[in-house]
Amino acid sequence: MVKIAFNTPTAVQKEEARQDVEALLSRTVRTQILTGKELRVATQEKEGSSGRCMLTLLGLSFILAGLIVGGACIYKYFMPKSTIYRGEMCFFDSEDPANSLRGGEPNFLPVTEEADIREDDNIAIIDVPVPSFSDSDPAAIIHDFEKGMTAYLDLLLGNCYLMPLNTSIVMPPKNLVELFGKLASGRYLPQTYVVREDLVAVEEIRDVSNLGIFIYQLCNNRKSFRLRRRDLLLGFNKRAIDKCWKIRHFPNEFIVETKICQE
């Protein structure tokens, strides 16, 4: 006898359910594997992004520190420490005809100035305001002991006049500080005499960039002329002089009257 067997519906359903479970488990495993990989990639990307942020912040910190240090150095170079001194001296002008005819006590004329004295730079910057009782011009004057130069900026004409520094009549900055200290304390009698300079503008200076930063700042973009002493000019024609003017200041314990003539 031959037996013929048939799958019952219940067995078919169990087989299909088993296959569904296996497929679900397979998809779950694949999903977990992919999720793990994605998490690792995301973690690596996050770590890489954090590293780049740290490097960027570190670079910005170095740049900021460099800017601060560089700015401080530039400020120190261009804005060095200095003290403004103010003082006044009086002098008797013996060449004034009015004084020679005047009887009694002599008439002393005041010379007032402000001095920006920078001992570290070995320089004195003197500001001579408009005088009240004399015929001299207001001026800005630089005595640069490092460069060995003196520069006069006539504030009425707007021109610069340059000459070698005359150390026989200009005190070094340290001594000038002491002089202004005496004037301020009243320990020095501010009545003195006059030393006269007779100078002539002989040639125009086109470039002042090699004369130091201070003279450059004073005279750049201005007409600048070289000064020579009149007594050193051979064959000098006095008739060629068109105009002369005076600048008075005290770079010492006396007044210096600088007479400048120009064609």
UniProtKB/Swiss-Prot annotation:
Topology term for the membrane: Single-pass type II membrane protein
TM spans (from-to): 54-74
GO cellular component, one term: plasma membrane
Single GO BP term: plasma cell differentiation
PROSITE patterns: BRICHOS (PS50869)
Main location per the UniProt record: membrane
Glycosites: N166
InterPro entries: BRICHOS_dom, ITM2
Protein name per the record: Integral membrane protein 2A
Gene of this entry: ITM2A
